[in-house]
């Protein structure tokens, strides 16, 4: 009977040790993921800055993520180039205006 108790105690100890290592690995993975998210948050392109070379990296605004808006620019030589900047699309501006107005009315 004593041998069975010793074996059971040993198994419980091994299982708890291996599960705690698994949890530590999980926490390390979560930490790395959070650090990667923070780094991408730092690398986003602010409002009114150029996003011609990286159109999907605009930062978030108050309610929505800014969109890369492009226009065609004609230089003095007659050459056409595309220039893009991060900005708020008109329908997002309208939604922000309605939400702001609602906050003023309803507090």
UniProtKB/Swiss-Prot annotation:
It comes from the Eukaryota. Keywords: Disulfide bond, Knottin, Secreted, Signal, Toxin. Residues 1-20 form the signal peptide. It is found in: Secreted. Pfam families: Toxin_35. Expressed by the venom gland. The keyword Translocase does not apply. One of its GO terms (molecular function) is toxin activity. GO terms for cellular component: extracellular region. Its main location: secreted. Residues 21-41 form a propeptide. Disulfide bonds join 44-59, 51-68, 58-86, 70-84. Belongs to the neurotoxin 19 (CSTX) family. 04 (U1-Lctx) subfamily. The presence of a 'disulfide through disulfide knot' structurally defines this protein as a knottin. This is U1-lycotoxin-Ls1s. It comes from Lycosa singoriensis (Wolf spider).
């Amino acid at each position: 009977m004593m041998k069975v108790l010793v074996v059971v105690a040993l198994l419980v100890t091994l299982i708890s040790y291996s599960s705690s290592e698994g949890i530590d690995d999980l926490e390390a993975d979560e930490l790395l993921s959070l650090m990667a998210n923070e780094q991408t948050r730092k690398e986003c392109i602010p409002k009114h800055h150029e996003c011609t070379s990286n159109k999907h990296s605009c930062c978030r605004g108050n309610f929505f993520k800014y969109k890369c808006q492009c226009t065609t620019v004609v230089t003095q030589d007659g050459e056409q180039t595309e220039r893009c900047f991060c900005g708020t699309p008109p329908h997002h501006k309208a939604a922000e205006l309605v939400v702001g107005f609602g906050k003023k009315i309803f507090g």
